[in-house]
Amino acid sequence: MKTALSGQVAVVTGVSRAKGIGAAIARELAKHGAHLFLTGWPGYDDEQPENGAGEQGLLLEELRQLGVEAEWTPLDLSLADAPRMLWNVVQARFNVAHILVNNACFSMRDSVETLDAEMLDRHYAVNTRAPILLSVEFVRRFGGKGARRIISMTSGQMLGPMRGELAYVVTKAGLDAFTITFGAEVGHLGITVNAVDPGPTDSGGMTTEVQRTLLSRFALGRLGRPEDPAHLIAFLAGPEGGWVTGQVLRSRGGFE
């Protein structure tokens, strides 16, 4: 059965854990018929408390059972040449791409006492430089060849303070600014550019204490789930989302 994204190729970065937002995005796009090329970086992901070591193969099998092609490759997005390398591999495998989802991020707690140039550079490389260069190279290779979608994951750094995350918030804010202006730059090529802020999302790493603290701040009475932003991203990736561009969309369940 033909679906909204049948035959299209989506590239999603930052996909490692089966319960993560990246995996939820991949599942939702696959349900709509998109073939998938996924990346993750075990060197960073496996250090996280909710790491998903060894789950990539299971996720690929799950996606393939939905009737789409799916590939995964490790990729260190902190490398300056990573965007070009990724698009070379994608073109060799699928020849074309229609959707880019910049989901990968780098986050380490910091403070006035610990913030330094190295920490800023590490955040900038993954949270700002990589998605910008991935997006620019995507447009260079596939722009003007029909509808294309660029969707980036962001956070609520422009809505209020996020203490202990100085490097993270400033580098994510740069991606927000890029989204707004890049949408205007490439609209004439049939490309939409948007960002999604999912708010606090329980993807398996929240402690019970954190869950209790956050719950009362959601107007809709529950914590965010990985599937919530995935639904919105599938809409933005599809034909119905073609009139939305240059926007940072807040899909936060009324969180404040």
What are these regions (language model features)?
Residues 3-41:
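Canonical Rossmann dinucleotide-binding motif of NAD(H)/NADP(H)-dependent dehydrogenases/reductases
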Residues 98, 106, 113-132, 151, ...:
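Catalytic Tyr-X3-Lys loop
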Residues 111-112, 119-121, 206, 214:
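Substrate-binding pocket helix/loop in short-chain dehydrogenase/reductase
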Residues 140, 180, 184-185, 242:
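Alpha-helical segment proximal to the catalytic Tyr-Lys
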Residues 159-160, 212-217, 234, 245-256:
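Short C-terminal tail/terminal secondary-structure segment
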Residues 187, 192, 244-246:
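Short, small/polar-rich loop/turn modules that mediate ligand/substrate recognition or access, typified
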Residues 218-229, 240:
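A conserved structural motif in NAD(P)-dependent oxidoreductases
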